[in-house]
Amino acid sequence: MQSCTAPNTPKEAKQEPFCRDLDDIKAAGKLRALTDGSSTSYFIYKGNPIGFEYALLKRFTKELGVNLDMIMVENLDSIEVMLDRGEGDIIAANYNITDLRKSKLDFTQPIFTSDQVIVQAIPIGWDTLSQTQREQWLIDSISDLYGRTVTVRQGSSFHEELLKLKNQGIPISIELSDESTEDLIKQVADGQIELTVADENVAKLNMTYYPNLIASISIAEDLPIAWAMRAQAPALLDSANRWLSKFKSTRAFAAIQLKYFKARSQHRLKVLSSYSSLGGDQISPYDDLFKHEAKRIGWDWMLLAAMVRKESNFNPSVESIAGAKGLMQLLPSTGAHFGADSLSDPAQNIRAGVAFIEAVMERWEADSLDTLNLIKFTLASYNAGVAHIKDAQALAVAYGANGNDWEEVSPYLLKLSIPKYYNHEVVKYGYCKGIQAYQYVNRVMDYWGHYRTGYK
């Protein structure tokens, strides 16, 4: 195991390894996962983050007691460099364990194993071909690869396996690309390239999107797929291994595998949906309204979308027990005050909701909050009311905390349900169930982070 040492002096050329292990992750309250935007790992569907890797990581981070930050890597050639630089803590991207990768990274126990298969497309006029012609076209053995061109991602485990075949004397033409595996599979389906290689689970899933594809021979069998991390994170590795050992034997793990790798027709509809970050470019049917109204308050429209996802799950007809209605869950009195005649009308509801947000933001102008803190204080105020958040701020200041930093104020919001604190002389509005507003802010910020990652 490599050790973590002090940074190099300017005279030293070698870069010391980045160090961030389990204790650092728990102290920061966040695990940063490097992943790819793919149908197997991670994507957004109808405003919700989903994917096999995401589902596992979400449960693992819950076990650790930390939040999850998904970092989507556009070019997987750089994923190991990003890990090495400390831009993430773990690689979770349907990542094969190979001898070359093991020399640089630590891997967990295998999550599952998969063959690597050749992906090819059925040619137009297949039904008119004779049996002999079909047999000549189909790749049924390694020898059928002689003289064929196979395109794979540069630096991938597929490239390593093809090189092994080439070193065995099989004259394969290998074309390297910086495209993702799923992009290359699509290119095979579209006739842009002849062949590619994919993990069998990924190939079979993509075959539901492109019916003209088949997975032919395996060029490598039962290759393990796992999470990868820096050698300088032994405690994280041990924790992940212990968790995987237990979780892989549960019904929950079997259900996740079924959802993403076996119930392919259902998964296909999600991936190809216009409300998928893979198949389309929409978060919800109301994106145009979000884009228009968010400009009034200087917000990223995806932040407004994240807020509506939390408020109503994009359901314009929903009504709470307290009588709050529509996309932004406004009380009729609030809606009327901000000009909404019908809260079931999405345009009116969003317009009134944004006007309400603007009024809340004005209440915080005198505090000179930075942009991110203004967003968080505004979200909390929208949920719990400005008065209770002002109480939490005053309480934080009374105990020596920074009243303009949400991370320092939020613990005192949680204390407003305790008599010792809500009876404090600086607290004007008494009891508040602060956990609701605290979780509200975290959830909206979490959705916003996913939307910014998944949609470019």
Walk through the language-model features, giving the residues of each.
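Extended ligand-binding regions for polar small-molecule ligands
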Residues: 8-16, 22-23, 54-63, 120-157, ...
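A ligand-binding cleft/hinge motif common to bilobed small-molecule-binding domains
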Residues: 77, 81, 93-104, 163-165, ...
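Export/targeting segments at the very N-terminus of extracytoplasmic proteins
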Residues: 264-313, 347, 364-368, 456
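Periplasmic-binding protein-like
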Residues: 37, 110-127, 200, 204-242, ...
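Substrate-binding/active-site groove segments that recognize
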Residues: 317-341, 348-359, 444
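Extracytoplasmic small-molecule ligand-binding "clamshell" domains
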Residues: 4-103, 173-178, 183-186, 240
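Catalytic and substrate-binding regions of cell-wall glycan-acting enzymes that process beta-1,4-linked
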Residues: 378-451
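Bilobed "Venus flytrap"/periplasmic-binding protein-like clamshell domains
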Residues: 32-41, 46-62, 113, 117-179, ...
